[in-house]
Regions:
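Alpha-helical subdomain
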Residues: 1-227
Length: 227
């Protein structure tokens, strides 16, 4: 991303306020984290408080994704431009929200951006025996997957996106994606760490998926994006 042409107009990161406070503390203390931000901005263009850092090209915001009005207000304060093509990425986020809460977030995103792509990485196939064992193990650690109902299958993942106002949706499990990687790259990855339980790894990858949905962007070819 040193090439200016590859940089997004602005990058937004959202996490719980308590997590953002810790991240901001690390950014302040570690030059390795602060230097890339300062290289792109003069110090007088940076705004920071306990739960937010905002600048011309980067913002990190402390917010609860279940509280849409608060989220929207904070994004507006950081000058999010909903007219620009926007990529939204969630990694094991929606599964910790109730289906109603995640649907509200997805509908808000679909309604807010003129041209957008939403990428979601989380669990899938959670109705089978392996999935149930995963759920039980997490519950024993007091980690409840409030939105696991929508993680039954690839179809339920796609339907969740389409019913929330996205125009197209696709989903693939991670084992399928892994099988499509170039063999040389797979060998390189597997040489980094010895895996003596390939069957377990395959089962795990069959229970995580990548889903993506698009809205608008026909001139950008968003609907044609595949793997």
């Amino acid at each position: 991303f040193q090439d200016e042409d590859l940089l997004p107009s602005k990058y937004f990161e959202i996490d719980f306020p308590m997590i953002v406070t810790r991240k901001l503390h690390s950014i302040k203390l570690k030059p390795l984290l602060s230097k890339p931000i300062l290289d792109l901005h003069s110090e007088d263009t940076l705004q920071m408080d306990g739960h937010t850092l905002d600048s011309t090209r980067y913002a990190i915001i402390g917010a609860d994704l279940r509280d849409i009005p608060e989220l929207e207000e904070k994004l507006k304060k950081c000058n999010m431009n909903t007219q620009l093509p926007t990529l939204l990425v969630a990694e094991c986020v929606l599964v910790y929200m109730t289906p109603e809460q995640s649907a509200n977030l997805l509908k808000w995103a679909a309604n807010s951006f003129e041209t957008a792509m939403f990428i979601n990485y989380e669990q899938v196939n959670m109705d089978d025996r392996f999935g149930q064992i995963m759920i039980e193990n997490l519950r024993r650690r007091q980690c409840d997957l409030a939105g696991v109902e929508t993680c039954k299958s690839l179809e339920s993942q796609k339907e969740r996106l389409l019913s929330s106002g996205w125009e197209s949706a696709s989903a693939v499990d991670m084992m399928e994606l892994y099988s499509k990687l170039p063999r040389a790259e797979v060998s390189r990855i597997e040489s980094l760490e010895f895996l003596d339980e390939m069957e377990l790894l395959e089962q795990l990858m069959q229970h995580y998926c990548l889903c993506w949905a698009t809205k608008g962007g026909s001139n950008l070819g968003l609907k044609e994006i595949t793997y």
